[in-house]
């Protein structure tokens, strides 16, 4: 087995989730890196011990482990394609707990089969739920789970409390917390507004339809 000590670990995005992940990694005695469209304040970088990269290419070429914590939008859809993965260190790892479509499905499989990537882990798929014949189920050196791996009983209690607060504020006509806000008055809003780019990512509905076979088709049809 292996451990993280001494490795270069980088996060793609350092918003609420990305920064929290980096803080949790600090006690493991790793060298922490991040890329984000908006650089964190100098005092935060110093406190956590972060090295900033002004491009995702710079980040992935430096780190042995890359964790993806950015939202899915036009600029990040298919970001980890064959070209970007080729810039990663030989034998590096990707952890994707953001969105499945941020990574090119076949590019991940090819990199694992060729040995360029040592491993890929995550709890996000495209389409989701993943059909039985999804290639990520059978590719080598993967650590995939359903998109429920972080849903502990404690987390579910926090989700419920957050939903209740949002509904209570909505019915009372009160302003929502910035961290709970995504869109306001027709525009991006809240603490994560700067993380997105204008436009829409592809719906993926036609691509997803290609995977509708057997149990998956029955499940989709039952939800209509």
Each PLM stretch: what is its role?
Residues 1-20:
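Glycine-rich NAD(P)-binding loop of Rossmann-like domains
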Residues 1-5, 26, 86-87:
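Short, flexible hinge/linker loops that cap or flank conserved catalytic cores
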Residues 8, 30-31:
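Residues at the starts of beta-strands that form the adenosine-phosphate
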Residues 22, 26, 112-113:
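Gly/Ala-rich phosphate-binding loop of Rossmann-like dinucleotide-binding domains
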Residues 36:
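Conserved acidic E/D residue at the C-terminus of a beta-strand in Rossmann-like folds
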Residues 39-135:
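Rossmann-like adenosine-cofactor binding region
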Residues 126-224:
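C-terminal helix-to-coil terminal segments
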């Amino acid at each position: 087995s292996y451990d993280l000590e001494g490795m270069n670990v980088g996060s793609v995005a350092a918003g609420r989730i990305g920064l929290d992940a980096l803080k949790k990694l600090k006690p493991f005695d790793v060298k922490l890196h991040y890329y984000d469209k908006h650089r964190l304040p100098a005092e935060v970088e110093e406190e956590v011990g972060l090295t900033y990269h002004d491009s995702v290419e710079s980040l992935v070429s430096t780190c042995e482990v890359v964790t993806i914590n950015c939202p899915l939008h036009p600029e990040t859809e298919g970001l980890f394609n064959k070209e970007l993965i080729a810039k990663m260190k030989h034998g590096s790892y990707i952890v994707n707990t953001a969105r499945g479509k941020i990574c090119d499905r076949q590019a991940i499989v090819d990199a694992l089969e060729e040995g360029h990537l040592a491993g890929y882990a995550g709890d996000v798929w495209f389409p989701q739920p993943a059909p039985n014949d999804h290639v990520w189920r059978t590719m080598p050196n993967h650590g995939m789970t359903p998109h429920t791996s972080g849903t502990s009983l404690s987390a579910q209690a926090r989700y419920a409390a957050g939903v209740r607060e949002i509904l209570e504020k909505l019915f009372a006509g009160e302003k929502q917390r910035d961290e709970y806000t995504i869109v306001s008055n027709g525009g991006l809003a809240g603490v994560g507004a700067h993380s997105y780019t204008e436009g829409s990512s592809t719906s993926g509905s036609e691509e997803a339809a290609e995977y509708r076979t057997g149990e998956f088709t029955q499940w989709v049809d039952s939800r209509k």
